[in-house]
Amino acid sequence: MSKLTDVPKRILIGRALRSDRLGETLLPKRIALPVFASDPLSSVAYAPGEVLLVLSIAGVSAYHFSPWIAVAVVVLMFTVVASYRQNVHAYPSGGGDYEVATTNLGPKAGLTVASALLVDYVLTVAVSIASGIENLGSAIPFVVEHKVLCATVVIVLLTLMNLRGVKESGKLFAIPTYVFVGGVFVMILWGAFRGLVLGDTMRAPTADFHIRAEHQGLAGFALVFLLLRAFSSGCAALTGVEAISNGVPAFRKPKSKNAASTLAAMGLLAVTMFCGIIALAATTKVRMAENPATDLLHNGHPIGSGYVQNPVISQVAEAVFGKGSFLFVLLAAATALVLFLAANTAYNGFPLLGSILAQDRYLPRQLHTRGDRLAFSNGIVLLAGAAALLTVIYGADSTRLIQLYIVGVFVSFTLSQTGMVRHWNRHLAVEKDQAKRRHMMRSRAINTFGAFLTGLVLVVVLVTKFTHGAWVALLGMCIFFATMTAIRKHYDRVAEEIAAPEEPDDDLVRPSRVHSVVLISKIHRPTLRALAYAKLMRSDGLEALTVNVDPAETKALRDEWERRGIDVPLKVLDSPYREVTRPVIEYVKGLRKESPRDAVSVIIPEYVVGHWYEHLLHNQSALRLKGRLLFTPGVMVTSVPYQLASSEAAKMRARRRQEWSAPGAVRRGPAGERPKEPSEPSGSAGASGASGTSGSSEAPGSSGSSAKD
């Protein structure tokens, strides 16, 4: 790693951690709750408002249905929590819904679940941050005026926090999450005390407004459809529940028990806050409208485009605490902050799921590799990029983004619970112990009811939200599914192609002879080292090769070659069009054609430099040549490095990075146990791959040439 990128990376992300410190990043329950459950906990900041927005289509009279919708959401939440408690005990490895569906329903069902969850994680980041920006914008106008920019900045900051490691980010996120939860409970209790004990009349700032209903007097099927749509909007309170089942490996031992306890606590807190806010909204007469400028009426007139519609939780807090009071400001700040931090659920769930998918060869294997801070860095960056793109496309508008929401999570809910039913059926078929059978039958009953209820809700969500944006989420799921299927086919095809055969084939037969070719442009120390290394290989044939792009330089090279008496034949390739790469490629192919059973070893001298700008000052055409040679069967490419004096600076930087636990420290071992590097360049040649990334290479005959390949 270069000095230019190393120092900023260490400042932003921190020192690299050794693999044996992975246990130090595992989470206790008090930290796991805000890390994994911040999404469903924070959803009470916008889920009640989404319910009222849908009901407002039928006017204020439809608001009396909101408590019943809240009851339906509570029943659904408790059902899902009870179902997932069975999941974390049966599958503690962290695969969550993906592992359950794959094991019990097959690979296609598993991929469907994975696609749904990946889309939902991206939407979690986009929705949470967009909603947080809008809440913050009610106090700071600049934020609303630059929503997309501010949302993107928050995504970048969250990404950096998570790249430092889940435990550190969890500690930071715990404080505002607990302040938010505590503030909401204080608001609910104080509001209940004022209303029930003191008899105070609490009124929201919109209590005197009227709503211009789009459809008056809805009844029959139209009313049922409206209520179902409002219920599906309220189901946003359930998003993120599955993150705990995906993140079981991140918990401290006993992992399953701690995850199940955290899941139960999350469900209880979320439904209590959701119901409390719905009840206070009804008590304080909160009014919401999808188009407030035209649908909210004050004294019989539209309120106008200058009106900013505050979220339900903000209006309730103003009615309970009083506008501008300390508790009002504290809750408003905590609400905005916790909405930003709710995205952290996805920052933990997405990389973990991506790692499992990569291990199963459905995603690039780089997603399975942990970064310097023992986090799945590639998955974190991928999630951030996708969420930022979605935020820009939708203008950081939470109302539009929420229409895409929750489709994926209910797909995973339904398939996961269906898979758990099959899981218990399989175990009941072989289990003889009556106590264990009773426990399994109870778990099966819970998962059966969960599968039925979540499947029913999925149908409701698809029917009521398809034209409002759910089709975009479905399209994203299809794209993920097709991409992962193609990646798996590619990995399977490559594995089959490179598998070691039982019988010897041409690739395994020892070559009859090895013909070595040393590429040179002039006689200097790197050339002499490459020739010495080639002689050590004891090849059956050895020659030096140069390309004649400048007759004067070629003649000078021949003369010095003869004067020095170098005992290696010099082959000169003519190049009328001053090309370097093509003549060499054609010559090497000719050697292979003459003797197909022979192997050709192409040896290239290489400069090792210490500064990035030195790469620009040396001829790079040999690097292109090496890249072309990789596609020539039977040709081996070897780089012989020669360390220039400036490479000592790079060695000094490497020694300093050892004290910083630089990247690669995990593979090299503790800094104190690593062997000292020699202060002088090694006299022996080293071989490297054809990529030539360790330095600059000189192409044969290219010195001083401006010709293009």
Predicted features and spans:
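Helix-loop-helix junctions that connect adjacent transmembrane segments
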Residues: Y178, G182-T239, T464, H468, ...
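Extracellular loop-to-transmembrane helix junctions
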Residues: V51-T102, P107-A114, V127-V154, L269-A270
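Cytosolic C-terminal regulatory domains/tails of membrane transporters and channels
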Residues: M1-R21, D492-S682, G704-D709
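Extracellular/periplasmic helix-exit of transmembrane alpha-helices
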Residues: G191-M202, L263-S314
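Hydrophobic alpha-helical segments and their helix-loop junctions in multi-pass secondary transporters
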Residues: V181-I211, I278-R287, T414-E431, A486-A495
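Loop-to-transmembrane helix boundary motifs in multi-pass membrane proteins
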Residues: P107-G110, K147-T152, A250-M273, S355-V392, ...
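C-terminal membrane-solvent junction of multi-pass transporters and transport-like membrane proteins
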Residues: Q366-N378, F413-L458, V463-F466, E497, ...
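Membrane-interface "cap" regions at the ends of multi-pass membrane proteins
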Residues: M1-P48, L53-A58, A82, S93, ...
